[in-house]
Swiss-Prot record:
Amino acids binding Zn(2+) 1: H62, H64, H123, D140
Locations listed in the record: Cytoplasm
Cofactor: Zn(2+)
Pathway(s) the chain acts in: Antibiotic biosynthesis; bacillaene biosynthesis
Source species taxonomy: Bacteria, Bacillati, Bacillota, Bacilli, Bacillales
Top-level EC class: hydrolase
Alphabetized Gene3D superfamilies for the sequence: Ribonuclease Z/Hydroxyacylglutathione hydrolase-like
Primary location class: cytoplasm
One Pfam family per UniProt: Lactamase_B
Keyword Zinc: yes
GO molecular function: hydrolase activity; metal ion binding
Protein name, entry field: Probable polyketide biosynthesis zinc-dependent hydrolase BaeB
Residues annotated as binding Zn(2+) 2: D66, H67, D140, H181
Entry's family note: Belongs to the metallo-beta-lactamase superfamily.
Length: 225
């Protein structure tokens, strides 16, 4: 599908954590969106300056601190709108300036971009993926190599199963997937690669999925690269 924007990956660090944030920039419109900005604000503001774009909107996939901690600082600089699912906002009582609640399946315009929201609970109660043309931003719902853990308040492996089944059924194989973390694979792999290589996309029975996702003594859950 034709589009005029570019996707820029920004890897940020804080102690043991590494995250992938994304800037979606349309230089012809001098506009950009950030997805899950975190940890190192200079990396993000420097990239926006380099691209000569204004940060019109911030998309948050869920409310965990390592995905939202730069939302308000960036909003104060650029006066951006901030988007999150209404389910996530309500369950965790998330609050910040210029916060706009989204419903499932909503198509909306932000900064000149057309975006579709896809509610994908599992890792959190109201996780949300964002689809722009042929690019899907998944936060901690789907990684290239796996899916998000389901052990915190509001998490549900059953919900995660249904979210992944929904993604499998609705996202075309050519769409590129941009998660919030990596275990070694570069973000931006095509959906067809995940369908072939991500074990969570291959488990068809909910009971088997839940047992596998919640199995004991898992290692390397936070060994992000």
């Amino acid at each position: 599908m034709d589009h005029t924007y570019e996707v820029h990956q920004i890897k940020t660090y804080h102690q043991m954590w590494s995250n992938y944030c994304y800037i979606i920039a349309d230089r012809s419109k001098k506009s950009a969106i950030a997805v899950d900005p975190s940890w190192e604000i200079d990396k993000i503001t420097d990239k926006l300056h380099e691209l000569d774009v204004d940060l019109s909107a911030i998309l948050l996939t869920h409310s965990h601190y390592d995905h939202v901690n730069l939302a308000e600082p960036l909003q104060q600089i650029y006066h951006s709108d901030i988007y999150m699912s209404s389910a996530e906002i309500d369950f965790y009582q998330f609050r910040c300036r210029n916060l706009i609640a989204l419903e499932d399946g909503q198509t909306f315009a932000a900064g000149g971009f057309i975006i579709r929201s896809i509610l994908t609970p599992g890792h959190t109660a109201g996780g949300m993926c964002y689809l722009l043309s042929d690019h899907l931003f998944t936060g901690d719902t789907v990684f290239t190599e796996g899916c998000g853990i389901c052990g915190d308040r509001g998490s549900s492996a059953e919900d995660m199963f249904h979210s992944i089944q929904r993604i499998k059924a609705s996202i075309p194989p050519h769409v590129r997937v941009y998660p919030g973390h990596s275990f070694g694979e570069k973000p931006g792999q095509k959906m067809e690669s995940l369908l072939k290589n991500n074990i969570y996309f291959q488990i068809e029975k909910k009971e088997h999925f839940v047992n596998f996702r919640n199995r004991k003594n898992q290692k390397g859950l936070f060994h992000f690269k």
